[in-house]
């Protein structure tokens, strides 16, 4: 399974990649929204992990673009946010499959919860096909 990780924080990107690879996933990186959109269309991942605070194109605009593109709109997107759950309902309405609050305080716990979220979303996506 291929996961596109769109995250501008090198620290978060490396931590999430390590957890995903350990869980058996192949990871594609994108450090900004523009690169993330391009990678999604070129690589057609099974899942997108999308940070909300990105340079060039915001996470919300990336989510809207992904869900508006017939080529990739079927790909589930898990939104990653360090700002808490204030916009969770709005992002789920925009098409996010799940919302994940990231924390730098408990990285190990973060990683295991993220993997659980990834597995749940991918399992739901398979069930719908």
Spans of model-derived segments:
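The feature encodes the CheY-like receiver
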Residues: 55, 73
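Two-component/phosphorelay signaling modules centered on CheY-like receiver
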Residues: 10-28
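Alpha4 helix (beta4-alpha4-beta5 surface) of REC/receiver domains from two-component response regulators
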Residues: 61, 83-119
């Amino acid at each position: 399974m291929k996961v596109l990780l769109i995250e501008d924080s090198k620290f978060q990107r490396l931590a999430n990649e390590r957890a995903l690879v350990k869980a058996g996933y192949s990871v594609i990186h994108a450090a900004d929204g523009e690169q993330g959109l391009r990678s999604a269309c070129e690589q057609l991942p099974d899942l997108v992990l999308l940070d909300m605070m990105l340079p060039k194109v915001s996470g919300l605009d990336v989510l809207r673009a992904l869900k508006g593109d017939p080529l990739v709109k079927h790909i589930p997107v898990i939104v990653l946010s360090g700002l808490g759950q204030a916009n969770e309902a709005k992002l789920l309405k925009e098409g996010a499959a799940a919302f994940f609050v990231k924390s730098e305080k408990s990285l190990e716990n973060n990683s295991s919860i993220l993997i659980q979220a990834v597995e749940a979303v991918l399992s739901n996506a398979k069930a719908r096909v």
